[in-house]
Amino acid sequence: MSTRANTLQENSATEFSSIGPDVWQGKENPLFIESDNLCAAWKTHALENDHLSVRIGRWNIPGEPIVILVDFQPFFEKKNDIYTEMWNRFQVDSLHAYGDYDEASMFSYAAGRVVESFYRYNLTETDKVVYQAHEWMTGMGALYVQEAVPEVATIFTTHATSSDVR
């Protein structure tokens, strides 16, 4: 992100923000500059009405893009329900997952919930919004957004390569 954020902001007529996991909880993050003013009313709404704990600020990188950090830990207690929902709606099979699948999925789901909450509170269907998910780790959030906020366009980017050239 540090190599692209400045370019995105300079060459775009739109706002650019990102959503990240709040893994530093309670500790100072040298890459994050927290703001008490950015989206303050929505932040309160998100916590009180949508049960989303977020911190809002800017990445401490060139361009200083806005970032919303979300605490995704509370979603672990609902993990089985979330996976059931993903299976029923999209046939995403989480039964045989391993490694960092759970952590990535819970963050991704939380990010999707953040988009839904932010959109419903701040925007209307005439606003043009794109949710870009990078790699499989954020795919669940894109699926959630497609279902919960169909007004938001979704893009999935993968950087996978294959050495199996035929």
Explain the meaning of each model-derived region.
Residues 1-166:
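Catalytic cores of nucleotide-sugar-dependent glycosyltransferases that transfer UDP/GDP/TDP-activated
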